């Protein structure tokens, strides 16, 4: 699985990212070593530019990063557009594991922004969003036509499958999950009666309350074999819907809940958040649900794990030392936190350390303020 965060793609044993010049780097999780993803002798690692339109470095990438560059089954894959041919077309690029012999393997039409990617079995599964409508001459005829959906590419024959689109203001895909030839994905959008002007006015008054009152959060499934899209549920007045192992976890003013995508039933979770605020996203590993709550009066963040409706406290940290879990990949827990120099950083701890309440992260990368 790949997880996009800032310009970073997180894997089980490494992290890939593109630097400001579009050069691919790999960070080895075990050692923390950051290296340019290139094994060509004497390469200067020059990226794309006006004076270097065809760089020889296999680590050079161009265009919107989209969902980043992913190592999978001994190949390097990239979903994006490095040709500037058409802003509504993206490609799946396939290359050798060292970045050489790059070729376009599949064409994705009517897709402007790739927002996430997942590699499972023999599929590339991605989420996208569009904002503008173009005519045949590629002129903008409507700059406010938001829509979003998912695509699936079969790596055996590079056939492209497309789900039905969701529309309306700020339509977006927030999570994707794959299991047994079915893709589950969560969506967010404003109701059909909410206009862009209403959103602007609501944001200027109280953006968080306006979103809570007017956002619709959905869970869909896409059956690849039948090429069928089904809306399983759409919920209003909730916060931060997350797909964890295919089920939808979220909170509202009434507490924490999980929507079971198989039974299509919702049940409340025994999480006591009275007088507390969720800190960071919910995450799962096996049967455990990990969550953190900040306490308004104590300036502390408490970390828990939940199993069989029983919560276990793992640790307490001051808000200055607190962290958010970005991803749990096997025994590696990737976290974001602020280091002693005030920089936002990506680091890693082991799952065993998390369960024992030990937070001594290995720093992998720090982000500039503009990132």
Residues covered by each model-derived region:
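Residue-level signature of beta-propeller blades and closely related beta-rich strand-turn architectures
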Residues: 21, 82, 129-132, 189, ...
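Short loop/turn segments that connect beta-strands within beta-propeller blades
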Residues: 28-32, 96-100, 154-158, 223-227, ...
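Residue position within the beta-strands of beta-propeller blades
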Residues: 17-18, 77-79, 125-128, 184-187, ...
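A short beta-strand motif characteristic of beta-propeller blades
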Residues: 1, 35-38, 43-60, 101-107, ...
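Blade-level signature of beta-propeller repeat domains, shared across WD40, Kelch, NHL, RCC1
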Residues: 326-371
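Repeated scaffold domains used in trafficking and secretory/extracellular systems
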Residues: 2-11, 46-70, 110-121, 168-180, ...
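A short loop-to-beta-strand structural motif that recurs across blades of beta-propeller domains
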Residues: 23-25, 91-93, 149-151, 218-220, ...
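Short, conserved, GDST-rich strand-edge loop motifs in beta-rich repeat architectures
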Residues: 81-86, 128-145, 188-214
């Amino acid at each position: 699985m790949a997880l996009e965060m800032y310009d970073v793609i997180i894997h089980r044993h490494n992290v890939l990212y593109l630097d400001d010049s579009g050069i691919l780097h790999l960070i080895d999780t075990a050692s923390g070593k950051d290296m340019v993803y290139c094994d060509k002798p004497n390469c200067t690692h020059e990226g794309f530019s006006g004076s270097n339109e065809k760089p020889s470095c296999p680590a050079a990438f161009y265009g919107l990063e989209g969902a980043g560059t992913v190592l999978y089954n001994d190949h390097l894959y990239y979903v994006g557009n490095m040709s500037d041919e058409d802003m509504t077309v993206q490609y799946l690029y396939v290359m050798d594991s060292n970045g050489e012999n790059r070729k376009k393997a599949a064409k994705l039409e009517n897709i402007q922004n790739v927002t996430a990617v997942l590699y499972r079995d023999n599929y590339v599964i991605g989420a996208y969003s569009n904002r503008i409508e173009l005519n045949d001459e590629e002129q903008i005829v409507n700059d406010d036509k938001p829509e979003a959906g998912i695509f699936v590419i079969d790596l055996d024959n590079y056939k492209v499958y497309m789900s039905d689109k969701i529309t309306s203001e700020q339509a977006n895909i927030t999570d994707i999950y794959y299991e047994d030839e079915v893709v589950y994905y969560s969506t967010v959008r404003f109701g059909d009666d909410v206009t862009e002007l209403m959103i602007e006015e609501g944001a200027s008054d109280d953006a968080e309350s306006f979103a809570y009152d007017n956002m619709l959060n959905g869970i869909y499934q896409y059956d690849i074999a039948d090429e069928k899209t089904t809306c399983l549920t759409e919920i209003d007045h909730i916060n931060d819907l997350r797909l964890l192992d295919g089920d939808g976890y979220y909170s509202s003013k009434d507490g924490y809940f999980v929507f079971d995508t198989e039974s299509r039933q919702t049940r409340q979770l025994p999480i006591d958040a009275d007088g507390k605020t969720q800190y960071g996203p919910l995450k799962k590993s096996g049967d455990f649900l990990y969550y953190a709550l900040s306490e308004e009066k104590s300036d502390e963040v408490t970390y828990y794990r939940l199993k069989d409706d029983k919560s276990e406290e793992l640790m307490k940290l001051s808000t200055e030392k607190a962290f958010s879990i970005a991803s749990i990949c096997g025994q590696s827990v990737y976290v974001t936190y602020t280091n002693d120099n005030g920089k936002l950083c990506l680091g890693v701890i082991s799952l065993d350390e998390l369960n024992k309440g030990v937070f001594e992260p290995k720093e992998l990368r720090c982000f500039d303020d503009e990132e």
